[in-house]
Amino acid sequence: MLYLTKIRNAESEFTGNEQKIADFLRARVSELKSVSSRQMAKQLGISQSSIVKFAQKLGAQGFTELRMALIGEYSASREKTNATALHLHSSITSDDSLEVIARKLNREKELALEQTCALFDYARLQKIIEVISKAPFIQITGLGGSALVGRDLSFKLMKIGYRVACEADTHVQATVSQALKKGDVQIAISYSGSKKEIVLCAEAARKQGATVIAITSLADSPLRRLAHFTLDTVSGETEWRSSSMSTRTAQNSVTDLLFVGLVQHQ
């Protein structure tokens, strides 16, 4: 489980004290071997229980487990950095050659895949596969790059016999959402989870009794709160928005895994 990634992606939902803890852990990750929760609490002016609760919020049993995991992640990250001439999160610049751009893009996509797979809840995926396999009708929603991912998934699902709608027009998406029934499934794809059109479709689907499955980031969002199930994706941020490309890579890895799981389930 990549806790540094979870911290970065969950920042939008942190309280003031939680943000202090997150900032400390990221800034001092190389020094955590010699830091106790008591020392950390004193330095930040917060209670030890706040630190323990923060660790548990991220999925650790307590601060000790979180601290050891972060130390391990830091060591692994250093080894990877030393093994390549490119920094993991280096941005593409106007001076880069095509070869350097290709290497940076490939590394960004590799990182998105590694982090998405590391954070994946496979038990939840199995449950989602069971729900989709019983659905009389499936709607897939998304905008921009997410819509392309959705269209690809819709073609795959139709090939194996599912009734699927994946419309590019947002008005048509809304209309289809309002016609869903109990037992139907809506798969909403949005990395931010805050696109108004996608959120409105999810609200309509829930109102109709359909099951909403969101393929989205770890950050708290309206779509995440509406969904019955979530499939988490992770993508870095860079200056030239290779993030949108790595986001699509992460989303495609999730939808491909979902598709193969459904094929096996048949």
From Swiss-Prot:
PROSITE patterns: HTH_RPIR, SIS. Keywords: Carbohydrate metabolism, DNA-binding, Repressor, Transcription, Transcription regulation. Pathway: Amino-sugar metabolism; N-acetylmuramate degradation [regulation]. Pfam families: HTH_6, SIS. Transmembrane segments: none annotated. Residues 1-77 form the HTH rpiR-type domain. Residues 128-266 form the SIS domain. One of its GO terms (biological process) is carbohydrate derivative metabolic process. Residues 37-56 bind DNA. InterPro entries: Homeodomain-like_sf, HTH_RpiR, RpiR-like, RpiR-like_SIS, SIS_dom, SIS_dom_sf, Tscrpt_reg_HTH_MurR, WH-like_DNA-bd_sf. GO terms for molecular function: carbohydrate derivative binding; DNA binding; DNA-binding transcription factor activity. It comes from the Bacteria. The keyword Lipid biosynthesis does not apply. PANTHER family: GLUCOKINASE, HTH-TYPE TRANSCRIPTIONAL REGULATOR MURR. Represses the expression of the murPQ operon involved in the uptake and degradation of N-acetylmuramic acid (MurNAc). Binds to two adjacent inverted repeats within the operator region. MurNAc 6-phosphate, the substrate of MurQ, is the specific inducer that weakens binding of MurR to the operator. Homotetramer. This is HTH-type transcriptional regulator MurR. It comes from Shigella flexneri serotype 5b (strain 8401). The gene is murR.
